Curated annotation (Swiss-Prot):
Residues 114-352 form the Radical SAM core domain. Keywords: 4Fe-4S, Cytoplasm, Disulfide bond, Iron, Iron-sulfur, Metal-binding, Methyltransferase, rRNA processing, S-adenosyl-L-methionine, Transferase, tRNA processing. S-adenosyl-L-methionine binds at G179, E180, S213, S236, L237, H238, N315. One of its GO terms (molecular function) is metal ion binding. Disulfide bonds join C121-C358. Binds 1 [4Fe-4S] cluster. The cluster is coordinated with 3 cysteines and an exchangeable S-adenosyl-L-methionine. GO terms for biological process: rRNA base methylation; tRNA methylation. Its EC number is 2.1.1.192. This is Probable dual-specificity RNA methyltransferase RlmN. It comes from the Bacteria. It is an enzyme of class 2 (transferase). It is found in: Cytoplasm.
Length: 365
């Protein structure tokens, strides 16, 4: 097993990007417009352009007087990042973008097109401080938090690409890219509010179509429940026992399995939403029949019908000694979890060959 890395909850103190329109809530937008000496109605106009028409360049905002476009661009729409590399697979249905921020920081997002939906997997941090040994992102360490605008710009870029490509619409947003979302709590919550707010205050994506993942920061899970955002909570559990989870998911040394599941139950009770349990199945590590039985027993006892297990065949990462469990073992694991009365399916893995699947994002390049 790889030498453990330290847990990092607080991002290194690095300068954040300049203020961007997407960092601002409704009152902040009004204040920013007033600072520029513009009429109050311009704030709503700019929001309609950004969130409704997906335009982030004021020089293209035709309902804005030409004389003020450059001033608005300089004050509210600085360049945050650009695409450093783009790669596709699945016949063009999966597309990974490596973004490079103005300070050189890199992070990734993945756009996945399905017959019935379009999903973008976005990053909340550049890197990750949770140090999970089977995850390429966790092994790379934490560089810095992303700003609210950097998070939202990933969503806007994906939405604009779908629209421009074939008139498609973004339907789902999952915070399953780089980083631990609940370790960048305030910015992630602000981003979720604007993702789900109706136009002109946000992108208008249903809260039920937004998923926030976590390795199990129990107090933050409870805090998120009290926000009443009603997004889907995805808990990366990966094993039901503390002995193994202390190593597989090092944050377990801070909050044990039972405490994390208790927080998940609180989330389900407050929101009425089913909690998703993410479980990367690793050959001869966490795929034993007794672990399937214990997982089903614990989840059924804590969450009853308000839980679903997503089994994820382990995706390969450079230098890893681990690989996915054989299909017969996977099928038996599913059967045993279901036998305990818990819904369980194997996730459709996209992007494995371009290192765009779960646990593979490393922002290299």
């Amino acid at each position: 097993m790889p030498n453990p890395l330290p847990l990092v909850f607080d991002a290194p103190r690095r300068a954040m990007p300049p203020r961007h329109f997407a960092d601002l809530d409704e009152s902040g937008r009004a204040a920013a417009v007033a600072e520029l000496g513009l009429p109050a109605f311009r704030a709503k106009q700019l929001a309609n352009q950004y969130y409704g028409r997906l335009i982030a360049d004021p020089t293209q905002m035709t309902d804005l007087p030409a004389a003020v476009r450059e001033r608005v661009a300089d004050a509210l729409f600085p360049t945050l990042f650009g695409a450093a590399r783009e790669i596709e697979c699945d016949s063009g249905e999966t597309r990974k973008v490596l973004w490079r921020a103005v300070d050189g920081t890199t992070f990734e997002s993945v756009l996945m097109r399905y017959p019935d939906r379009n999903t973008v997997c976005i990053s909340s941090q550049a890197g990750c401080g949770m140090a999970c040994p089977f995850c390429a992102t966790g092994q790379g360490g934490l560089k810095r938090n992303l700003s609210t605008a950097e998070i939202l710009e990933q969503v806007r870029a994906a939405s604009a690409e779908l629209r421009d490509r074939d008139g498609g619409r973004l339907s789902n947003v999952v915070f399953m890219g780089m980083g631990e979302p609940l370790a960048n709590y305030n910015r992630v919550v602000a981003a979720v509010r604007r993702i789900t707010a109706s136009s002109p205050n946000g992108f208008g994506i249903s809260a039920r179509s937004v998923t926030v993942s976590t390795v199990g920061l129990a107090p933050a899970i409870r805090k998120l429940a009290d926000e009443k955002l009603n997004v889907t909570l995805a808990l990366s559990l990966h094993t039901p026992d503390d002995e193994l989870r202390d190593t597989l998911v090092p944050v377990n040394n801070r909050w044990k399995v039972d405490e994390v599941l208790d927080a998940a139950r609180y989330y389900a009770d407050v929101t009425g939403r089913r909690v998703s349990i993410e479980y990367a199945l690793i050959r001869d590590v966490n795929d034993q029949p007794w672990r399937a039985d214990l997982l089903g027993k614990k989840l059924h006892g804590e969450l009853g019908p308000l839980v679903h297990v997503n089994l994820i065949p382990l995706n390969p990462t450079p230098g890893s000694e681990w690989d996915a469990s054989p299909k017969p073992v996977e099928r038996e694991f599913v059967r045993r979890v279901r036998a305990k009365g818990v819904s369980c399916t194997v996730r459709d893995t996209r992007g494995r060959e371009i290192a765009a699947a779960c646990g593979q994002l490393a922002a290299e390049g």
